[in-house]
């Protein structure tokens, strides 16, 4: 079962009773290359996957962000208790130039896209009511990061 294409969510969202789709909210100070890569990747995802309840993605120019639990992280997913409240994702991209310097442009962009994929996997776990332990959730998110990045890589030469 591919949780990105699983339709368990239909019992909640099939009546068009919520806003749908994925929306990027990118800070003006986010570098052009990161902005471009995220927009292209999001356009590709919209064609390939369903987003039955809107998932805003807040893209920050800082190196880290604070999660709701107070942890300082690179990316986070807010999972509401109510299935009709929109979740959201926040991603920090301020370490792009350091990643580019150490790993190269393509790997730096892939790392940022990977963070988005990881958090979107948590979105799909949430909408499809996938019950796993915390370790299981993270393992699954890490696995799907590689799977989705691999699918995307087949469609272009560079991220």
Over which residues does each language-model region extend?
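Zn2+-dependent metallopeptidase catalytic core
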Residues: 35-54
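A short, highly charged nucleic-acid-interacting micro-segment common to nuclease
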Residues: 26-36, 134
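Short alpha-helical functional segments enriched in proximate histidine and acidic residues
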Residues: 48, 123, 148-151
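Long, well-structured alpha-helical subdomains associated
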Residues: 2-25, 32, 152-159
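Alpha-helical scaffolds flanking conserved acidic
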Residues: 109-113, 137-139
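Active-site scaffold of zinc-dependent metalloenzymes
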Residues: 68-109
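Post-HExxH zinc-binding segment in Zn-dependent metallohydrolases
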Residues: 134-159
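Active-site recognition of the HExxH zinc-binding catalytic motif
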Residues: 114-127
């Amino acid at each position: 079962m591919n949780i990105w294409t699983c339709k368990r969510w239909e019992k909640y969202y099939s009546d068009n009773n919520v806003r749908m789709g994925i929306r990027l909210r990118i800070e003006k100070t986010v570098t052009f290359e990161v902005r471009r890569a995220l927009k292209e990747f999001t356009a590709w995802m919209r064609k390939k996957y369903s987003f039955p309840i809107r998932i805003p993605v807040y893209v920050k120019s800082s190196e880290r962000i604070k999660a709701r639990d107070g942890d300082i992280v690179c990316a986070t997913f807010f999972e509401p208790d109510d299935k009709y409240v929109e979740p959201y994702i926040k991603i920090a991209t301020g370490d792009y130039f350091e990643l580019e310097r150490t790993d190269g442009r393509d790997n730096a962009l892939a790392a940022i896209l990977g963070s988005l994929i990881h958090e979107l996997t948590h979105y799909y776990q949430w909408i499809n009511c996938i019950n796993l332990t915390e370790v299981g959730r993270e393992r699954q998110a890490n696995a799907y990061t590689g799977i989705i990045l691999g699918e995307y890589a087949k469609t272009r030469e560079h991220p």
